[in-house]
Amino acid sequence: MLLSELSHPNELHGLTVSQLEEIACQIRERHLQVVSTSGGHLGPGLGVVELTLALYQTLDLDSDRVVWDVGHQGYPHKLITGRFSQFDSLRQQNGVAGYLKRSESKFDHFGAGHASTSISAALGMAIARDRKGENHKCVAVIGDGALTGGMALEAINHAGHLPNTPLVVVLNDNDMSISPPVGALSSYLNKVRLSPPLQFLSDSVQESVKNIPLIGKDIPEELKNIKGSVRRLAVPKVGAVFEELGFTYMGPIDGHDIENLINTFNAAHRLKKPVLVHIVTTKGKGYPYAEADQVGYHAQSAFDLTTGKSIPSKKPKPVSYSKIFGQTLLKICEQDSKVIGITAAMATGTGLDILQKNIPEQYVDVGIAEQHAVTLAAGMSCDGLKPVVAIYSTFLQRAFDQLIHDVGIQNLPVSFVLDRAGIVGADGPTHQGQYDISYMRSIPNFVLMAPKDESELQRMLITSINHKGPTALRIPRGSGLGVAVMDEGWEPLNIGEAEILEEGNDILIIAYGSMVASAIETAEILKGMNINTCIVNARFVKPLDKNLIIPLASRIQKVVTMEEGTLIGGFGSAIVELFNDNEVNIPVYRIGIPDVLVDHASPDQSKEKLGLMPDQMADKIIQKFKLNN
C-alpha cells in the first residue's frame, strides 16, 4: 500500500507488519523531501514513525484520543491523517501547520507548541469520557525532555491517584529534547533504558504462580505482593518511580520494532488503568546525518539531502541577535565569575551554547522548567550571583507567577533576555513573542528595554547586569542589521533614557526595539511626500523618558507609536497612559499587533497581513492624520 493512498488512519488496521514497515519508509522519504526543501522539524518526527504506525493500528481515531506533546513529533501523524498531498505547504502561509492544530484536522485532538501539556490534556479527556459513560481510549505521547517539565509530573501525580481511569502515557525516550535533557530524571531514564522489559517479566512471574498446585487461577493478595517484590529483585529500580506513583510500567521497548510495539500497546489498552509505556527511539532515525547530530537536526532550514548541509542563502545575512547576545555574555562572564547564564533546554536557540562550551561552570540548563529557572535565578541573586535568564518570550509566559512573586515583589537583580520577541514566523501562534511587553509591564520594579540594533543590545546587556533590580531585555528572532559590535568596553545606558534619531516637525514616531528600523524606513517614505518626521528610539518601555517624549509630543501634536507586540497593554498603551497621567491631550496612533492570533507564515508575510510593513504604515499615518491634503 502507498502512503499517498491512505485516506484515513483506520486503514492501517488491516495491514501486515511488513506493509507497515513499507509505509514507514515512505513516511521518512516524504518527511525528508519536504523538510529539506522548505525547512522544519526533522529529527523528532523521524524518530517516531514506527511508534505512530503501531499505536494507530491499535486505535480507532474516529473515537479514541491521542495527544501529542509539543507537536515536534507530529509530522508522521499528519502524513497518515489526510495531509499527505498538502504536506509540501508545511509551515507556509495558509499551509499545513508545523504543530498539531484542532482547527486543521479532526484527528488533531489537542493543539500544542509548548512542552509538557499532553498528560494533563489526555487525563482531562479520560475523566470526561468516564463521566459520560463512554469507553474510548485516551493516550498521551510525551518525550523524555518534556517529562522534565513540572506540569507533566503534576499530571502523573494526579493520574496515578485515579487507579480506575484508563490512560496510556507513551514515553518517547530518545535521550533528547531539543538539546540533551538534564537532571536526575534524565539520569534515571538512562539507567532504565539499558534494562530488560519489566511488565513482561512481571507477567511471566504471574503465569508461574498460576501453575502452582492448590492455587490455580486465583492469586491471593499476598502473592500479588510477593510478585511485585520478585519483580523488583529481578530488575532493580526499573520503572519503580512510575509504579510508586500509581502507574503500571511497561518497557523499555524498542521503538522501531513495529510488531513488538503493537503487542505492547494492545497489552497496555487491556489493563484499563494508568499505564506508562516506555519506548526507546532514535531521534533522526533513518537519516544518518540527523542520527549523528541530533541537536543540529532537531529543526533545519532547507538543506541538501545528499550532503546534509544547509543550503546557503543567496545573500549573506548578518549574525543573529541570539549569537551576538551569547558572544557578549561570554565576554562578560570571562570578566566576572558571578555572572551565570541560565536556560530552559534552549542553549543553542538562545545563544548560550557558546557559554556552555567555554565556561560550563557559569552555565545552567534546568531542562524544560521555566518556572524553576526563574525562581532558581531569584535564589542565586539573593546570595550575590548575577543570573542572566535567556528564554524565549513565548516560554516565559509559563513563569508569570514566579516573575511577580519571586522576582518582582522582592526587587531582585535578575536579568531576563527574551529571545524570539515579536513575530517569529513559521512556528505560528503558539510561538509568537507578542505578549511580553504587556504581561511584564504590569509587574512592579521591572525595567523593560529593547535594542534598535546589535550594538545597543550589548549596551543593554551590561546595563541589565549592572542594575540593582529586575530587568527584561527583548530581542527579535533572526539576523541583526549588520551593525558593528564591540568585544569589550560597552557603555551602560542610563535607565529610562530615550534618544532622538531624526528631527522633524510634522509627525513624531516613537518606536520600540525592532520597530525602530521600520520607523526609519517609514520616515523615508513620508519624506518623499514632504512630511518631516521626528523619530525617537524609546529604548525603554518602563520607565519611559517622559522628559524627552512629552515636550516633543506637545510641540509636534501628532504622535505615532510602533511596536512588534500586541497593542493591548503594550508600548503604545504605555505612551497613552503617560500622556493621560500628565494631562497631555494629544492624539496617539498606535501601530502594532491587534487582538488577533498570528498564524504561521514568513515574518514578512505576517507583518504584511498585520499592516506592519513600512509602506503600509506610511499610508496609515497619512490617512490617520489627513496629511495628503
Curated annotation (Swiss-Prot):
It comes from the Bacteria. Binds 1 Mg(2+) ion per subunit. Pfam families: DXP_synthase_N, Transket_pyr, Transketolase_C. One of its GO terms (biological process) is terpenoid biosynthetic process. Pathway: Metabolic intermediate biosynthesis; 1-deoxy-D-xylulose 5-phosphate biosynthesis; 1-deoxy-D-xylulose 5-phosphate from D-glyceraldehyde 3-phosphate and pyruvate: step 1/1. Gene3D superfamilies: 3.40.50.920, 3.40.50.970. GO terms for cellular component: cytosol. Keywords: Isoprene biosynthesis, Magnesium, Metal-binding, Thiamine biosynthesis, Thiamine pyrophosphate, Transferase. It is an enzyme of class 2 (transferase). CDD domains: TPP_DXS, TPP_PYR_DXS_TK_like. Thiamine diphosphate binds at H72, G113, H114, A115, G145, A146, N174, Y287, E370. GO terms for molecular function: 1-deoxy-D-xylulose-5-phosphate synthase activity; magnesium ion binding; thiamine pyrophosphate binding. Its cofactor is Mg(2+); thiamine diphosphate. Mg(2+) binds at D144, N174. Its EC number is 2.2.1.7. Belongs to the transketolase family. DXPS subfamily. NCBIfam families: dxs (TIGR00204), PRK05444.2-2 (NF003933). PANTHER family: 1-D-DEOXYXYLULOSE 5-PHOSPHATE SYNTHASE-RELATED (PTHR43322), 1-DEOXY-D-XYLULOSE-5-PHOSPHATE SYNTHASE, CHLOROPLASTIC (PTHR43322:SF5). This is 1-deoxy-D-xylulose-5-phosphate synthase. It comes from Prochlorococcus marinus (strain MIT 9312).
